[in-house]
């Protein structure tokens, strides 16, 4: 007999594998000493959405940074155009300028090899309960990474990895702003080859070079990130 699924239960959206390069737009900057999972995705009023990934994601950072969801969705719209094989620049003039600036320095960069998404910068995210939605909600809004000084818990970092997000650590202080564009060339190779220091560039700040690290990752975790998420990892392997 056919399985009956209630309207309140929604599928996970498709998640694409990691691309050769990444262009990340900063969608939230949090300078608090610690950011909790409850701040990343509140409990309580969100519980009725727990079987609706996109519905739940609307509450991401709602108490901490109410503008986050809109910013993340705006850059996710660019990625959807890219995934459809259409011209990002035509649809989004700002991205056209950014990609043009990148191509002047990295000429083999193009839409087919460069994924576009959001990242948050937080000093020490992930304290508190082990709720997986703190990571998955960012992912379904097009999040491709976190950048942090450190991660508050191993569990939050593991959740990022399982949702195919890069748990970057930055040692030196950098003054990130919302809407900064961070370009990471060769990120897929860096993950596969266990590159310790990954060079990235803040495009709109004169290509300021920053150094990112991924820290310890098992071979399986590297494959999960490359495949796009744990769901894909089981599908592909």
PLM feature segments, named:
Residues 1-237:
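Fe-S-dependent hydro-lyases/dehydratases of central metabolism
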């Amino acid at each position: 007999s056919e399985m009956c699924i209630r309207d309140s239960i929604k599928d996970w959206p498709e998640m694409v594998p990691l691309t050769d390069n990444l262009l990340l737009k900063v969608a939230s900057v949090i300078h608090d000493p610690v950011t909790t999972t409850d701040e990343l995705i509140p409990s309580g009023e969100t519980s009725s959405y727990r079987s609706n990934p996109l519905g739940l994601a609307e509450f991401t950072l709602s108490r901490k940074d109410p503008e986050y969801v809109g910013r993340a969705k705006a850059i996710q719209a660019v990625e959807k155009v890219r995934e459809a094989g259409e011209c990002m620049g035509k649809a989004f003039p700002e991205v056209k300028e950014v990609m043009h600036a990148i191509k002047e320095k990295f000429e083999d960069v193009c839409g087919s090899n460069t994924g576009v998404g959001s990242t948050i910068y937080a000093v020490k995210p992930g304290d508190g309960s082990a709720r997986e939605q703190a990571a998955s909600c960012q992912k379904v809004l097009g999040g491709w990474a976190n950048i942090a000084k450190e991660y508050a818990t191993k569990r939050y970092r593991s959740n990022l990895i399982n949702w195919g997000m890069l748990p970057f650590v930055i040692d030196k202080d950098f003054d990130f702003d919302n809407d900064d564009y961070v370009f990471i060339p060769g990120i897929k190779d860096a993950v596969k080859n266990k590159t310790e220091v990954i060079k990235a560039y803040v495009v709109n700040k004169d290509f300021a070079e920053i150094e990112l690290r991924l820290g310890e990752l098992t071979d399986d975790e590297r494959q999960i990130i490359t495949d796009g998420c744990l769901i894909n990892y089981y599908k592909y392997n």
